[in-house]
Design a protein with these regions (language model features):
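Beta-lactam-recognizing serine transpeptidase/beta-lactamase-like catalytic domain environment
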Residues: 1-26, 30-281, 323-338
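Intrinsically disordered, low-complexity mixed-charge segments
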Residues: 308-329
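C-terminal soluble interaction/assembly domains
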Residues: 266-268, 281-285, 297, 301
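Short beta-strands and strand-coil junctions in structured, solvent-facing domains, enriched
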Residues: 288-289, 307
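Short amphipathic alpha-helical signal-transduction/dimerization elements
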Residues: 168, 219, 299-310
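Short, charged, low-complexity patches
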Residues: 160, 175, 290-295, 299-303
């Protein structure tokens, strides 16, 4: 127990609920939606990406040397253009930004029916002043990093899945549940969890459509293409590679970096694209690139979901287990009564 409890790897940490991580580029679809809803960008407006962004004395580079050229909103998601989001972040008011993101579940608990959930961090001016009293101002330079899911942003995998589900539902939020059915061990009576809409975020259909086209582009020609090649269903997704520590002008080489300092790998997904019925997040702590570590996991989950025989088998196993548990509990009650 002592070894488990003191391990640097924290094997007892419930990461989906209590692991707070920078979301990396999986945050960009939500930034794109915010840019449209707050009037910072239209889907048609394009920027010229030279491969870097300058602001005052600050310099932020794009992941692609030389840049992506002319980039509109849909392309910015499909090719994961950092420079596009540096600019959006620099132009946004941070408190309006946080106000927009909060209903997606960022910076607050989702309310799932399990204890121990953490709220993560959705930065505001007030948060910065309280967290860093010696440097209370939230600088525009801070915002630039936030725009690509780095910096002070930290969200749980559950929050990312929740936000993705809200996006898939075009703004309708359902409280997440782990418990599908509650069964009385003595009577055998059961009650199914009936998810119901909690609230609805007013979003313009055209704005959501543009983001979904960007997510489709990730799968068709972007970083999700290899993982979802020849899939029997349509899907949209976004990879994310979140830095654990910053590099100043150096080249990232995983083989030369301690494992617990390597980048985190993310992939958010929804399918089928026309009318999503599933939304998920795959996260690999210190896994490296999202396209290589997380996206293939998402593909396996999606395949199992859409393969009726696999899904039915999994559901049957769950039913059999619950019946076995109920039978064992009833037997225990009988023994105690005797």
């Amino acid at each position: 127990w002592e070894a488990l409890n003191t391990s640097e790897d924290k094997p007892l940490l419930n990461r989906p609920l209590r692991g707070a991580y920078p979301p990396g580029s999986t945050y960009k679809p939500f930034m794109a939606l915010m840019a449209q809803e707050l009037g910072i960008r239209t889907a048609q407006q394009a920027i010229s990406d030279p491969g870097f962004f300058r602001l005052g004395g600050g310099y932020w580079r794009d992941d692609k040397v030389g840049g992506h050229g002319a980039v509109d909103l849909v392309k910015s998601i499909a090719v994961s253009c950092d420079t596009y989001y540096y600019q959006v972040a620099a132009e946004a008011d941070i408190d309006e930004w946080a106000k927009f993101m909060k209903p997606f579940g960022f910076g607050q608990k989702t309310g799932i029916d399990i204890d121990g959930e953490l709220p993560g961090i959705l930065p505001t001016r007030e948060w910065k002043a309280k967290r860093f009293p010696k440097d209370p101002k939230l600088h525009v330079g801070d915002q630039v990093s936030l725009g690509i899911g780095q910096g002070f942003n930290t969200f749980t995998p559950l929050q990312m899945a929740y936000a993705t589900a809200i996006l898939a539902n075009r703004g309708v939020a359902f409280k997440p549940h782990l418990v599908k059915r509650v069964q009385d061990a003595r009577t055998g009576e059961s009650r199914l969890t009936q998810p119901a809409p909690s609230y609805s975020i007013p979003l313009k259909e055209a704005h959501v459509d543009a983001v979904l086209r960007g997510l489709a582009g990730v799968v068709k020609e972007g970083t999700g293409r290899t993982a979802f090649l020849n899939a029997k269903y349509t899907s949209g997704g976004k990879t994310g590679t979140a830095q654990v520590f910053g590099l100043r002008g150096g080249e990232y080489k995983a083989s030369q970096i301690a494992e617990r300092l390597r980048d985190h790998a993310w992939y958010i997904a929804l399918a089928p694209l026309e009318k999503p019925t599933i939304a998920l997040v795959a996260f690999v702590e210190n896994g490296g690139f999202g396209a290589e570590a997380a996206a293939p996991i998402a593909r396996k989950v999606m395949d199992a979901y859409f393969d009726a025989s696999l899904l039915e088998a999994a559901l049957k196993r769950n039913v059999d287990r619950s019946e076995q548990v109920a039978a064992a509990a009833q037997a225990a009650e009988v023994r105690r009564a005797r």
